[in-house]
A protein has these predicted regions:
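Short hydrophobic/aromatic-rich beta-strand segments that constitute the beta-sheet cores
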Residues: 72, 99, 135, 156-159
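Signature of long, low-cysteine stretches enriched in small and polar/charged residues
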Residues: 112-155
Length: 184
């Protein structure tokens, strides 16, 4: 069993390295890097987790892959304007993925707000499964965030913590982010 996990980790490392090399090559050409689920993930990796459906509104939902070691955390007790629509974490609370939905007048305005009031830095464009998104860091809170537009006036914010964990978390985080797509 441990050998299978090592092989999977090695395969993920190779895929991530290939992705990073392609990102560096694309950056030199001033193109936007892309993450595509089908390019990054094998059936073996996919089997180590499951897709979760997230309701954005009555008529809109997305799916993302969550690894088996992360559990869904009840958010019903949370209240206020920044209540998450979903929260997943490891039992030891060392790693988590929190999803928020926000209504926005424009993506540029939301990015400016995250930079000014949200503590965001290192904003970069990235294409996730054909959708142009924005990634950024919130260094003071050790968060890597992704802004995923779900409509003209609504965004999904995916916050992955911690930002600076070990290589396995970095690989897992990239797999999670590459899995985001509209639910069918």
């Amino acid at each position: 069993m441990k050998t299978g996990k090592r092989i999977t980790a090695l395969l993920c490392s190779v895929l991530l390295l290939a992705f990073l090399v392609s990102c560096n090559t694309l950056a030199l050409a001033e193109e936007v890097p892309e993450l595509n689920w089908t390019d990054l993930v094998t059936e073996e990796i996919e089997a180590q987790g499951a897709f979760q459906k997230i309701e954005i509104s009555d008529s809109l939902s997305i799916q993302l892959w969550i690894p088996a070691e992360m559990i869904s955390v009840d958010t019903s007790f949370m209240d206020g304007p920044f209540k998450p629509v979903a929260l997943y974490g490891t039992e030891d609370q060392a790693r988590s993925v929190i999803l928020f939905v926000s209504e926005v007048s424009s993506l540029d305005e939301y990015v400016a707000l995250m930079e000014k009031e949200g503590g965001g830095s290192n904003f970069n464009s990235i294409i996730i499964n054909g959708v142009e998104c924005i990634s950024y860091d919130v260094e003071k809170d050790n968060i890597l965030s992704l802004i995923y537009p779900v409509s003209d006036h609504m965004v999904l914010s995916v916050n992955c913590m911690p930002m600076d964990a070990d290589e396995n978390w970095e690989i897992t985080r990239n797999i999670i982010l590459s899995s985001i797509h509209p639910a069918e």
